[in-house]
Amino acid sequence: KQAGALLLSLAIIGGTVFPAGQIRAAAETKQPENSMKAATVSDAEKIPGTTVPGLLSRRPETMGKKRSSGGEVYVSASSSNARWDSGAGTEEDPYISLAYAVDQAEDGATICLMSDLTETKSARFWDKDLTIDGQGHTVFRGDGFEKAQDLARGGYHPAMIEVGGTRPGEAQTASLTLTDIVLDDGGKTEGVNFKQASTDGKGGNESLVQDAIVATYNGTAEIILASGATLRNFGGMSAVRLSGGDLVMEDGSQICDDTNGVADRTKEKGDYGAAGAVWIQGGSFRMEAGAEISHMRGRAVYLDGGSAEIGGSISDIRSDKDMWQGGAGAAVHVRNEGTAVLSQSGSIKGIAGESTEHTVIDTVIGDFEAVSGSEISGCRDIMVASANDQGKDYVHKMLLNGLISDCTTKGSLMRSWYAEITVGPTGQVSGCTATGAGGLLYTNNGSRYVFGGKITGNTAPKGIVYLANQSGGRVSARMLEGAEISNNKGLGIKVNNGSLLTMEGGKISGNTGAGVEVKGKTDKKGAAFIMNGGEISGNGSYGISYSNAGESVVELNGGTVFGNGSRAQISVTGGNSNDKNEFIHIKPGTLAGNREIYLSAGTMTLDEDYQEVWLG
């Protein structure tokens, strides 16, 4: 009865008691129920000095022994001790088990490895700050890794190391620092299903693979991967699981698969799939310059709420349909109000696509910013960026102020769906190729682009920017002062299917096709181009190519159109218009130099001092 009352009034994650209702919804994903009952907890299973149930299913028999004194604790597989919970933790008489060492170590201690270790028991601790100095050694996940148990999850497969505090809502009370060490999962899985464990106390989690190599669950701990720390070959859902709390990857730290092969984390039918190397559900992740996530199949960062600042390098990742959310965001996937920033020192390079529909960066109800100085380059057969704001309210943004270069795809380089993508004033997209039907930068249903930077030297036969509303809200794009869409192979901007392009400034020049193509359609009305400033010049075809159908409109209120390659600067096709909402409007001075306009009925040339012109 007491256990039942406890489960009704409290929720417990990672050995920590939370007031009911304060656990993030993302951590409460329900799984199919089974007959497993919540475990009872004896006094021996409680964290010392508290009444709080812990994650350990059985505390060491040596609980009452004097713990190792001093600031260093030693562990060696070559110890003469036979029992996992024996030894004094000294250089002369080291512990044999990392799990026992972290339990026995005092707050502030450094655990020093004297040899490689193969562990079959999770090393878990609470309310302590511990450093594990591998001294160049590796800790391997052994076969038959023991299950753990708590009231929230019942029996489950744990991470190699779990850290947390017992006082949620307070300042962080625990930390783990890893230095000069390799933790190697060996691509092994305990359990078979790639799903998030349920935390409703009903169990049913023993078939699920482990969450991570290293994990924290309740917002009270910090994990620091210091120089020389490597997490390798994660076999479960992630290498690091962060449900609240903080993760820092310092210069010289790494998460990767080894050179002997890249693990293929294949999910069963109905599974979510693995999350990624770093799996964040709340809390914060800071990846410093010199840190690296590389050489793996799947995903680098899965940000399900919380924040990530990426100042290190993400490279050599191949997307995989078997990941959670499939191939969306092989480098960074942001959702559930998460915010990710690729900082000045951050780079994403060499991401490859299993499918051209897969993406390097993907946001779903979340924000992403690449700041000036950041770089995304060398990506192959994959879309670089996709933004999806499912609330259709444009609250979430994708701001690109860094460099995107040398990326190729048979699809489009970017895409949005009810979202806004901004190429900021320092943003550059250059040297990229997209041969798909949607051009280089594609937008769909209710989406927006804002161009303030430079899009130069790219190749896209269907257009550098392709605006099209296929079945939803109106698509729009704005071009600002200082923006450039220039010297590309292909037309500059295609305005299709009722879309709107507004040019406030900037330059569309030197492209091999037309500067702007406005394609009116009777079944998808309202395509419009409004030019209030800037210039359209030096393009290989018409400055403006306009098909007057379906209440399409071109208004040249300011700026100039001049020096384009075709004999006429403007082409108007589609025959005579009998609709007052279908026209081209040219104000004085907006058409300069050669002032020819090609019409279905013939060619006309405006006088040098022409007055306002309306055609339609």
Each model region followed by its residue ranges:
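N-terminal extracellular ligand-recognition/capping segment immediately after the signal peptide
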Residues: 108-144, 234-236, 347, 597, ...
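Extracellular beta-strand-rich solenoid/capping regions of secreted or surface-exposed proteins
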Residues: 118-131, 140-180, 184-224, 237-245, ...
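Glycine-centered small-residue motifs that form tight turns
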Residues: 158, 203-213, 237-240, 271-278, ...
